């Protein structure tokens, strides 16, 4: 392509560079790019450190060899053996029962407390809200010891009732915080509008408030179930011999000798827990879109 090198009446003698091949600049590594690569590698290593043991455990739960030998041969024998293990089955059903009762009680109490914090101003409100966080930060070893001493002091002692009360105490702050976070996105004008149309307080709660915060309530309930079902330390302190939960029974079985059935039940627990967290995440996203 011919270039026009004329400016007015002056003709410039410029080289034709239209067909000159482009020479790419040599790529150099900057400090920012190097730090980004290091950070990316660190994230990959940490994800592998967290999830590789879980992956190995899941694979070994379906390996035919009871001694964790390779090569890998797929089998469902250990899951079938798990279904025939009366002790683990009883502990699993006991954990599910306690988790369901914990979910019901902590959700009802948590929603009531969240609505009270949302609707009313009273003396000590800020203090009570601040006291929701220490139970989640205090080591469960300390919490379990304190609960054991307290329940013996008031005559409850150990057993399923003590485990249930302990789990409700642990799960309740999660429900209040999750439901409270959802209530902060709720418009109080909706309740005022319903009241101006003649709705009673009960009708406002059931027909206006609860449907609007339903994703937060379900998310809090799932959190409560996960906290109860996976809880080991408090259950270990408060359980009676013969009436243990599944995490405690798994710990006892490992002390006697590690078997592939433990891999199988642990894999099931991890799948249930991860599924619960995915549902909670989806509910939060759905609530935000609404």
Give the positions of each predicted feature.
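N-terminal signal-anchor/first transmembrane alpha helix
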Residues: 22-57
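Interhelical loop and adjacent transmembrane-helix boundary motif
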Residues: 8, 15-18, 27-35, 79-87, ...
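Non-cytoplasmic
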Residues: 57-65, 175, 217-251
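C-terminal transmembrane helix and the adjacent membrane-cytosol boundary/short C-terminal tail
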Residues: 2-22, 26-29, 38-39, 124, ...
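Transmembrane alpha-helices
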Residues: 41-42, 47-54, 144, 176-180, ...
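Short membrane-interfacial helix/loop motifs at transmembrane-helix boundaries
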Residues: 7, 52-86, 236-241
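Transmembrane-helix boundary motif in ABC transporter permease subunits
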Residues: 27-31, 100-132, 145, 149, ...
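Membrane-interfacial helix termini and adjacent extracytoplasmic/periplasmic loops
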Residues: 22-29, 67-69, 76, 124-125, ...
